[in-house]
Amino acid sequence: MYKSQYISGQREKFVRLDDIDSSSSPATGMMMQRNCFGFNLKNRGGEKKKASKSFREGVKKIRSEGLITIGKSVTRAVFPEDLRITEKKIFDPQDKTLLVWNRLFVISCILAVSVDPLFFYLPIVDNSGSSCIGIDTKLAVTTTTLRTIVDVFYLTRMALQFRTAYIAPSSRVFGRGELVIDPAKIAERYLTRYFVVDFLAVLPLPQIAVWKFLHGSKGSDVLPTKTALLNIVIVQYIPRFVRFIPLTSELKKTAGAFAEGAWAGAAYYLLWYMLASHITGAFWYMLSVERNDTCWRFACKVQPDPRLCVQILYCGTKFVSSGETEWIKTVPELLKSNCSAKADDSKFNYGIYGQAISSGIVSSTTFFSKFCYCLWWGLQNLSTLGQGLQTSTFPGEVLFSIAIAIAGLLLFALLIGNMQTYLQSLTVRLEEMRIKRRDSEQWMHHRSLPQNLRERVRRYDQYKWLETRGVDEENIVQSLPKDLRRDIKRHLCLNLVRRVPLFANMDERLLDAICERLKPSLFTESTYIVREGDPVNEMMFIIRGRLESVTTDGGRSGFFNRGLLKEGDFCGEELLTWALDPKAGSNLPSSTRTVKALTEVEAFALEAEELKFVASQFRRLHSRQVQQTFRFYSQQWRTWASCFIQAAWRRYSRRKNAELRRIEEKEEELGYEDEYDDESDKRPMVITRSESSSRLRSTIFASRFAANALKGHRLRSSESSKTLINLQKPPEPDFDAE
């Protein structure tokens, strides 16, 4: 079977495993080459038949011919993806389905640990008629059924252990390693490690003891059944807990954690704390019945027939003699007088079990009330470390109290501590933010910053917290593989970049390159993004918010231009001109505008070096369509275009007005000459020729002086208008660079 991989941009084929004829001599010069993706086995000379069998054929021949051992280390070692082609179902330990089953098995182990203490509730003290100790048959049937169901799940898990591959220890040099899929090796490994523990844990010993009692003579089997259940459950707890620890650790290695959420993790550890309380309460109930039985036995020692008195302490004992029956009727009164836990002058000290005897829990037939009371007793004493327990001098009782105190300490140190860690993880970011704010306030107070600067710092911290919740998104993304990082950036930024008109019609490769290099930026109100004359080190693409863009054309007096930037606009276009210029040096261009945030602004920033790289790698930026789009949406080009149009309009208006004035002047001159001719005809002939010529010359001089004065005024006004509109054209990006 061949597997293809891409190495250094080329497609290579590698052989996973080959079946080599066992008849070939070792001296045939077999050469084995190990690659980083598999094994490549080649034979030289003396071959009797070819060793080009596929991996699937090798799996079929496993029963008869065996396997080739490579270096006596890894037998039938493959990679996880090769498990899918095997005919026999072998599970990958990190398979999702197997992880779900492992979680179910962990839950079944928890249920098994919680079901076993229910056997302690089977003994019951009957004080209704004759005082005796019996077995609750209904609860016995229910408990054995639950235990059998849990054991079925446990047996299923044991069966899966024979079909779950494991990682070969010799292949853990680099990466995850190779999986051993040989069923014989898997079975050998499981049988030598955990099979004995699993077998002891799943033995149906409690079911056998209860079944024997239910189908036996009952009366004579109460004491052996009670003793057997106590010993069996305690003994089987050891392998169950021993097997549960590696199961949870294995689940953490493959899945990371049993509960991923904070509340789920807290509930998981709280469940274990409640389970410990349940076990403690069940032990307390069983030991209470034992102490009651001990008191009755002490009372029977003073009777004429102690042996017969002990026999009647267990319900179901049959007697034939009428004399014995009459004597038995007096025994309950005797037991109550000697073993009453309510009397102040009781002859027997029950110690910590007196509460169970006096409350009637041991004689109650209602399981739910009995279970809740014992659960509360266990939870109360584990939480208080057994401080309220008043023990007697009985050694078993004292040891049980010591065990409660130690268990309480361990639970607080482990379970409650882990639960607190999970709950604190919900507010750890908030606590970090509070610490940073406190440090910031102390620093500002130490440096005596003015109130307006302090308010700006507080506003920025608050805005950044609301937007990111204390998560450093950039570090999270940068820690991922390149391919995954590119896909995440594409998902987050592609639609936003396409909303920028400059990149609306770009191809996918260019958009991916831009998205991969964008960095999120946040700005609060009244923050200056860039000032006029400062170097432009990044190009900003506005995602949300409004900004003000102002220019004075280098501080020219009387010149002021203001524009608004909104969602979809960009600033720092001087950087694009610099990036598209192949002859541009390392000096960054100066900003021609001052950009100030009017509201809270979210934007993506493209740094100078990143933009230079994108412009040099993608020729799509060097197109006329991009040139027109850049000019249309550039604030610098808009300002120049508006000034250019205004200047052209003024020139046109000036020429139009000059033409109108020339027409008016001609009309005035013609009208003046006509009026002068009419007045000359009406005058008397006495006027001499000399007087007429002198007046005409004066009129001509006056009209010329007025025309020259108007012309000078127009020239001065035109020169002043030229100085107002003389705005330098923005530099043209080199879109034709190749």
Swiss-Prot record:
CDD domains per record: CAP_ED
Main location: membrane
Region entry Calmodulin-binding, spans: 618-633
GO BP annotation list: pollen tube growth
Domain IQ: 638-667
Residue sites binding a nucleoside 3',5'-cyclic phosphate per the record: 502-632
Parts of the chain on the Extracellular side: 126-139, 215-227, 290-395
Function: Putative cyclic nucleotide-gated ion channel.
Domain notes: The binding of calmodulin to the C-terminus might interfere with cyclic nucleotide binding and thus channel activation.
Protein name listed in UniProt: Putative cyclic nucleotide-gated ion channel 7
Protein source organism: Arabidopsis thaliana (Mouse-ear cress)
Species lineage: Eukaryota, Viridiplantae, Streptophyta, Embryophyta, Tracheophyta
